[in-house]
Amino acid sequence: MRSVYDFIIKPVGKRYDIESFKHVNNIAEVVETPVAFATSIKKGDLIIVHHNVFRVFYDMKGIKKNSRSFLKDDLFFCAVDQIYLYKRKDTWKSFGDRCFVAPVKNKDILSAEKVADLIGILKIGNSSLKGSGINPGDVIGFTPGSEWEFVVDNQLLYCMKSNDIVIKYEFDRNEEEYNSRWAQSN
């Protein structure tokens, strides 16, 4: 069974039916790839998907419902734009125009915030960024509200689009990655 435009996936581990999006599982295994186009993602690859794919919610009458992605049993449809990363041979690779940035520790001694605003270290790039001379390990700046938190291999990372990265800091800033304890406990 293959879908024309969507991947068919199954969650790795439990789906979770907790209402907060931060606690919904977003790791899946690819069962089938779309028929309509070729993709770098193959059957059996692990992928990180949007939190609404496996989401369970309650309608206006209080009845428990599956997300629109639900197919049957433990299988779900997943659109191309709902996939952010895929893993093959122990290496995570970005998919499409997504990239992942590690937050950095806040050096401002007058601030109570632990993470610096709008700055990070590129961890997982893509071909668009590489073509612009922005590579993993570079200190970058990004636009406000563009980052979504993900925990990837027990590390807190921000997912964003390539166009959200607006500057590469060329001089040595001595930035240090921030990773909270809660990210390591997942």
Residue positions per predicted region:
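Acidic-enriched and Gly/Ser
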Residues: M1-N186
